[in-house]
Amino acid sequence: AICTGADRPCAACCPCCPGTSCKAESNGVSYCRKDEP
């Protein structure tokens, strides 16, 4: 299974990798970012 790594744009094909979540950025693009502890 392919997942989207941290600091990469969220992709419909590939969920964010474990430990990261899709977060909307100020430029309107959503990126997978590391979860905050």
Swiss-Prot record:
Keywords in alphabetical order, please. Answer: Calcium-activated potassium channel impairing toxin, Disulfide bond, Ion channel impairing toxin, Knottin, Neurotoxin, Potassium channel impairing toxin, Secreted, Toxin
Q: Which Cys residues form disulphide pairs?
A: C3-C17, C10-C22, C13-C14, C16-C32
Q: Where is this site: Important for the neurotoxic activity?
A: I2, V29
Q: Which protein family is it in?
A: Belongs to the neurotoxin 11 (kappa toxin) family.
Q: In which tissues is it expressed?
A: Expressed by the venom gland.
Q: Which organism is it from?
A: Hadronyche versuta (Blue mountains funnel-web spider)
A single GO CC term for this protein reads: extracellular region
What the entry lists under InterPro entries is as follows: Toxin_16
Name the domain of life this protein comes from. Answer: Eukaryota
The record's note on its domains: The presence of a 'disulfide through disulfide knot' structurally defines this protein as a knottin.
> Would you tell me the protein name for this molecule?
Lambda-hexatoxin-Hv1c
Where in the chain is the site Critical for the neurotoxic activity?
R8, P9, C13, C14, Y31
Q: What is the effect of changing V29A?
A: 13-fold decrease in toxicity to flies
Q: What is the effect of changing Y31F?
A: 1.8-fold decrease in toxicity to flies
* Effect listed in the UniProt record for changing I2A: 7-fold decrease in toxicity to flies
